Amino acid sequence: MSCQQNQQQCQPPPKCPAKSPAQCLPPASSSCAPSSGGCGPSSERSCCLSHHRCRRSHRCRCQSSNSCDRGSGQQGGSSSCGHSSAGCC
């Protein structure tokens, strides 16, 4: 085995690219429409967005108390959160 092959095997795996907001969004679905606050059918009471939780009002709320990026203009406790440095809030 050549030195070049050894070096290739010893290289660390590539870092994962930063997630874009598009990657964080769920697939298009009528139950995830913005008008429903991103929530699923009322019978399921599930939230289509990760790190969110649907409440009785069927609006998704961020579980995390961390605020989102200032550029999004949304805070962590709002019903429509932006993209935080740690992923989707």
UniProtKB/Swiss-Prot annotation:
Signals that turn on the gene: Induced upon stimulation with inflammatory cytokines produced by T-helper 1 cells (IL1A, TNF, IFNG) and T-helper 17 cells (IL17A, IL22).
Pfam families in the record: LCE
Classification via InterPro entries: LCE
Record flagged with keyword Zinc: no
Low complexity composition-biased segments: 1-10, 17-46
Tissue: Skin-specific. Expression was readily detected in adult trunk skin, adult arm skin, fetal skin, penal skin, vulva, esophagus and tongue. Not expressed in the cervix, rectum, lung, colon, or placenta.
Annotated keywords: Antimicrobial, Keratinization
Keyword DNA repair among record annotations: no
GO biological process per UniProt: defense response to Gram-negative bacterium; defense response to Gram-positive bacterium; keratinization; killing of cells of another organism
Region Disordered, annotated ranges: 1-46, 62-89
Sequence similarity: Belongs to the LCE family.
Name of the protein this chain belongs to: Late cornified envelope protein 3A
Organism, as annotated: Homo sapiens (Human)
